[in-house]
UniProtKB/Swiss-Prot annotation:
Localization: Cytoplasm
Gene Ontology cellular component annotations, sorted alphabetically: cytoplasm
NCBIfam families, sorted: PRK05218.1
Entry protein name: Chaperone protein HtpG
InterPro entries in UniProt: HATPase_C_sf (IPR036890), Heat_shock_protein_90_CS (IPR019805), HSP90_C (IPR037196), Hsp90_fam (IPR001404), Hsp90_N (IPR020575), Ribosomal_Su5_D2-typ_SF (IPR020568)
Coiled coil segments of this chain: none
């Protein structure tokens, strides 16, 4: 087969340009990335060989070799892992297969420290080789296949793939170093890099320097099997970088050994930065499962619930069989008990952190709060534990609050925890539905995450207090006393008979466009607002479902009018005096459209809305 010449995917070309010219301020990281990839390759073959031992072909001692050649100016990183086929070389090295590539490129800031973390999250550490190499050659043969392949590129837009004679199983990555990068041929320098970044790799990393004997230069023991007292914070951090493919600092580290009926070791990390794929629809978790130090899978859905998918790390079981299949894991009682133990530990760690006076928990909440809240809806058994970990914005100041603190601040006569949902915090604060609550000093939780709509309706109560939306018709503040000195609202209302006549006229004009028209107890400044009938889905939830084509159609809502507002009083007086002309009908539609706009909805008929606005302005300005 002749040599094939191919172009890099466009996004890869942009990435390579960033990597080579501006991204990494610490070039030695390339070696960590290549060793980490080699380790993953060996782990995957070790697992595959449990059921297909012939894949090993008599070579079962996994290792990673570093071979510097000062005369040729090359550094070669060799592993005897699973290797890559022809198509895998093209797919893995010529494209970024992970979703969200465009978002990744859009989020590059030019700040090396921030951008390097994005590189790691996308699993493209291989391209870091071009920081120090003017040409990269990958020679690889996949385990179980007879033919090997060679991939070559200078990182400038294209690469070639050709057959490779006598290729060994695994991969050999040869870097033709750039001028000025020869420090990476020095044995002492290579040893120090491996010691710093890759000492935790459980597979031996060896160095063959010229005519000297080959030597192992890492500890080659699984970090999680060591005692905590033997592990430094720096070693924990570097292991996190390896297992999470991340460059940020771990926000929290949890290392423990469970003993008893079920034995396992967990080394878990909570990142400090939000991964780009945290809201990907597959909600994949990222904790690697080992059985007696043999890698099994990094895609075990049963290991942790989706609402803890931000956790990174490893779990090593002593009780699962080595030949366990992914299908067997789905209903395995041992794994179920491990999952229960892990969730309890993680939630316990979060509880401890949330009680820390230093305020670092707010950093965690900003990154992962929306994900953790999924557990309120999905994990009914632990809903109270998770609710107590939650933090919320509210009308009580600018900071975050707990539900316990909210309940402690409830007013005399207040029998519910009041909420309002929406997309934007600033817009929620301006919602007319809040006016009556503010007037009586009643705090309202401001919920802006999509999951909020679901857990509030599912949980219903906390500390024997129901959750109630201020945008629903059932919100009743009649039992809550107004602050001393507050004006008597009833004294300033439109006369009851005039108001009744106006309401009937508005109902007649709007017809089925509204479910009802009512005088409002919640409005103090605005003329109108829309509310959902008791038991109906909120307007915000309906809007979300419509955006995903999951709502049957727009529902008619209740239009509340403020009997104390000058406009409403004026309209009421006009109707009582016999004014039922087209001007009143226009006013009714404008009131409804105003209420819709406040809710972030467009007028039902924009052209008619514009015509009515012009008509009203003409009468007001021109007489």
């Amino acid at each position: 087969m002749a040599e094939e010449k191919r172009q890099f995917q466009a996004e890869v070309g942009k990435l390579l340009d960033i990597v080579v010219h501006s991204l990494y301020s610490n070039k030695e990281i390339f070696l960590r990335e290549l060793i980490s990839n080699a380790s993953d390759s060996c782990d995957r073959l070790r697992y595959g060989a449990i059921t297909e031992p012939d894949l090993l072909d008599g070579d079962s001692e996994f290792r990673i070799r570093l071979v510097p050649d000062k005369d040729a100016g090359t550094l070669t990183i060799i592993d005897n892992g699973q290797g890559m086929s022809h198509d895998e070389l093209i797919a893995n090295l010529g494209t970024i297969a992970k979703s969200g590539t465009s978002e990744f490129l859009a989020r590059l800031t030019g700040d090396a420290k921030k951008d390097v973390s994005l590189i790691g999250q996308f699993g493209v550490g291989f391209y870091s080789a071009f920081m120090v190499a003017e040409e990269v050659t990958v020679t690889s043969r996949k385990a179980g296949e007879a033919k090997g392949w060679k991939w070559v590129s200078d990182g400038k837009g294209e690469f070639t793939v050709s057959p490779a004679e006598d290729a060994a199983r695994g991969a050999a990555i040869t870097l033709k170093l750039r001028e000025g990068e020869t420090e990476f041929l020095d044995a002492f320098r290579l040893k120090s890099i491996v010691k710093r970044y890759s000492d935790h790799i459980a597979i031996p990393v060896t160095l063959k320097d010229a005519d000297k004997d080959e030597e192992t230069i890492n500890s080659a023991s699984a970090l999680w099997t060591r005692s905590k007292s033997e592990i430094t914070p720096e070693q924990y951090k570097e292991f996190y970088h390896h297992v999470a493919h991340a460059f940020d600092e771990p926000w929290s580290t949890l290392h423990y050994k469970a003993e008893g009926a079920i034995e396992y070791t967990g080394l878990l990390f909570i990142p400090s930065s939000k991964p780009l794929d945290i809201f990907h629809p597959d909600r994949k978790q990222h904790v690697k499962l080992y059985v007696r130090r043999v890698f099994i899978t990094d895609d075990c859905e049963e290991l942790l619930p989706p609402y803890l998918r931000f956790v990174r790390g490893v779990v090593d079981s002593q009780d699962l069989p080595l030949n366990v299949s992914r299908e067997m894991l789905q209903h395995n009682p041992v794994l179920s008990k491990i999952r229960t133990g892990l969730v309890k530990r993680i939630l316990g760690e979060l509880k401890k952190k949330s009680e820390d006076a230093e305020g670092k928990y707010d950093e965690f909440w900003a990154a992962f709060g929306p994900v953790l809240k999924e557990g309120i809806y999905e994990d009914f058994e632990r809903k109270t534990d998770i609710l107590e970990l939650c933090r919320f914005r509210s009308t009580h100041g600018d900071g975050l609050t707990t539900l316990a603190d909210y309940v402690a601040r409830m007013k005399d006569g207040q029998d519910a925890i009041y909420t309002i949902t929406g997309d934007d915090l600033d817009q929620l604060k301006k919602s007319p539905q809040l006016e009556g609550f503010a007037a009586k000093g009643v705090e309202v939780l401001l919920l802006t995450d999509p999951i909020d709509e679901f857990w509030v309706s599912a949980v219903r109560s906390y500390a024997e207090k129901d959750f109630r939306s201020v945008a629903a018709a059932g919100a009743d503040l009649s039992k809550v006393k107004a602050p001393e000195g507050a004006e008597d609202k009833k004294a300033d209302e439109a006369p009851a008979d005039e108001l009744t006549t106006l309401i009937e006229a508005v109902k007649l004009a709007l017809g089925e466009r509204v479910k009802d028209v009512r005088p409002s107890e919640r409005l103090t400044e605005s003329a109108v607002c829309l509310v959902a009938a008791e038991g109906e889905m909120s307007m915000h939830l309906e809007k979300m479902l419509r955006a995903h084509n999951q709502a049957p159609g727009e529902r008619a809502r209740i239009l509340e009018i403020n009997p104390r507002h000058a406009l409403i009083k004026g309209l009421a007086a006009r109707v009582k005096a016999g004014g039922t002309d087209a001007g009143l009908e226009d006013a009714a539609f404008l009131l409804l459209d105003q209420a819709r706009i406040i809710e972030g909805e467009p007028p039902a008929d924009p052209a008619a809305f514009a015509r009515r606005m012009v008509s009203v302005m003409e009468k007001g300005l021109l007489g």
